[in-house]
A protein has these predicted regions:
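Charged docking surfaces used in two-component/phosphorelay signaling
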Residues: 16-24
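C-terminal output helix
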Residues: 107-116
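Short hydrophobic/Thr-rich beta-strand motif most characteristic of the beta2 strand and flanking loop
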Residues: 26-33, 41
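Short, glycine/charged-rich "phosphate-handling" switch motifs in NTP-dependent
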Residues: 100
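CheY-like receiver
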Residues: 123-146
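Active-site beta3 strand of CheY-like receiver
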Residues: 45-51
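Receiver (REC) domain active-site loop signature in two-component systems and cognate sites
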Residues: 56
Length: 146
């Protein structure tokens, strides 16, 4: 069965870029153009991974992540924030909100499939909390240097 990735981003070109590159690697891609439809799709389809933009009109990515974590049906789905917000504090917030990785735009779309595969291998091995802890430690170290 193909890995299912839900891309929640209000920018159609970003969703298309993700779709083309992930489908080329044999993954199934679901799309949502805003927070509410992303939540509905996540709850109905239970994807393996969610790529989530932060800056969306209405319900932003931070709130979407909070709602996903509060819902028993979706709280186990790994979230990768995919956003233009590159500040270290934003990255730390994303990980604090349950994200397992944080990719800043612009990004190399060819790197998405290997990222998703690696993430699923680690999460499947029960290392989700380890992945998040590593990211938080790295980000806190960088924040202390500022």
């Amino acid at each position: 069965m193909a890995t299912r990735v839900l891309v929640i981003d209000d920018e159609a070109p970003i969703r298309l870029l993700c779709r083309v590159n992930l489908e080329a690697e044999g993954m199934e891609v679901l799309e949502a153009a805003d927070g509410p439809s992303g939540l509905a799709t996540a709850r109905a389809e239970t994807p393996d991974v969610i790529l989530l933009d932060v800056m969306m009109p209405g319900l932003d990515g931070w709130r979407v992540a909070e709602e996903l974590l509060d819902d028993a049906r979706t709280q186990g789905i790994p979230i990768v924030f995919l956003t233009a917000r590159a500040e270290l504090r934003d990255r730390a917030r994303g990980i604090d909100l349950g994200g397992v990785d944080y990719v800043t735009k612009p990004f190399n779309p060819v790197e998405l499939a290997p990222l998703v595969r690696s993430l699923l291998e680690r999460v499947g091995a029960g290392e989700r909390d380890d992945v998040r802890r590593e990211k938080l430690t790295e980000l806190r170290s960088l924040l202390e240097r500022e």
